[in-house]
C-alpha cells in the first residue's frame, strides 16, 4: 500500500518557477543574463531590417492575443535586430521559446524577456562647497625695526559655481595665508634696516633749482678797468625837491669785485640762484627803506 504525498499550491508554483528559470538560463544554448523574468513576454532576436512591427504582430498572433510589439532601434531609428512581443493572456512562453521559427527565411532567436536587475548604484548628490572666508592675509616685512608696517590685501571673492575646488589647509606660521585651489610657495625676504633702530625716519626732498653761473672773463691786471654801476633812479614825489637816492645792484657789484680781485675769481665765479635771489631780496628791502626816508 502506497501513500501519495499531496502537493500544495505553493510547492507547485515554486517548482514551476524554478523550472522556468532553469530552462530560461540555458535557452537555446545561450546563457541568459540574471534578472526578473517578465510574464507573458517573449524576446525575439535576429529580426531582419525589412521586418516591421505589423508583420511580427500578425506572425505571433497564432500563440495568443498580442498586446504589444516593440523593436529596439538606435538614435537614428535603425533597428538593432531584436525586440519584444507581449501577450494579453497567459501563454506558454517556454513552448514558444522551444519552437523553431523561421521568418522570411531567417531563424529567429527566441527567449524569455528578462528585465535586468538594477545594480546598487549609490547616487551621491553633490553638495555645495562652503567657503569660510578667512581674515585677509597680512604681509609683514621681516626687519629688526620694532615699528613694523602691515599691508592688508583685499579679500578675494570666490565664485559660487566652482563648488569642487579642494582648499588646502593653511599653515599658521607662514607670513602669507591664502586659501586657493593650490598651495602657493612662501618666500621670506630679509633686508637689513637702512636707518638706526628707534630713529625717526625723515625724507629730505632736494629743492629743484638750476644753478645760474656767472663767468667772468680774464682781465689783464695792468689794464685799467672802469667800474660800471647800475644806478636806479627813484621817482621823486611832486611836493619835495630832495636829493635822489642811488642804489647799486649787488649782482653787478659781485661781477665788479671779481674783476678787481683776480685772486677771488674762482671763489666768486659761480653765483647760485639762491644767492642771487637772496641778494635781490636785500636789495628790495633797502630800496623800500630808501623810499620811506625820501618821503
Swiss-Prot record:
Record CDD domains: RRM_DAZL
Region (Disordered) residue spans: 1-25
SUPFAM superfamilies: RNA-binding domain, RBD
Annotated compartments: Cytoplasm; Nucleus
Organs and tissues of expression: Testis specific.
Region (Homodimerization): 80-132
All residue ranges annotated as the RRM domain in the record: 40-115
Gene Ontology molecular-function annotations: identical protein binding; mRNA 3'-UTR binding; RNA binding; translation activator activity
GO biological process per UniProt: 3'-UTR-mediated mRNA stabilization; female meiosis II; germ cell development; oocyte maturation; positive regulation of meiotic nuclear division; positive regulation of translational initiation; spermatogenesis
The DAZ domain, residue ranges: 167-190
Gene3D superfamilies: 3.30.70.330
Biased composition annotated in UniProt, kind: Low complexity: 11-25
Effect listed in the UniProt record for changing residue 54 to A: Probable risk factor for spermatogenic failure; this substitution may lead to affect the DAZL transcript stability and prevent its translation
Coiled-coil ranges (or none): none
Keywords carried by this UniProt record: Cytoplasm, Developmental protein, Differentiation, Nucleus, Phosphoprotein, RNA-binding, Spermatogenesis, Translation regulation
This protein's record includes keyword Cell cycle: no
GO cellular component: cytoplasm; nucleus; protein-containing complex; ribosome
Chain positions with Phosphotyrosine modification: 276
Record remark: domains: The DAZ domain mediates the interaction with DAZAP1 and DAZAP2.
Family stated for the protein in its record: Belongs to the RRM DAZ family.
Subunit organization: Homodimer and heterodimer. Multiple DAZL RRMs can bind to a single RNA containing multiple GUU triplets. Forms a heterodimer with DAZ. Interacts with BOLL, DAZAP1 and DAZAP2. Interacts with PUM2.
Function of the molecule: RNA-binding protein, which is essential for gametogenesis in both males and females. Plays a central role during spermatogenesis. Acts by binding to the 3'-UTR of mRNA, specifically recognizing GUU triplets, and thereby regulating the translation of key transcripts.
Name of the protein in its database record: Deleted in azoospermia-like
Organism expressing this protein natively: Homo sapiens
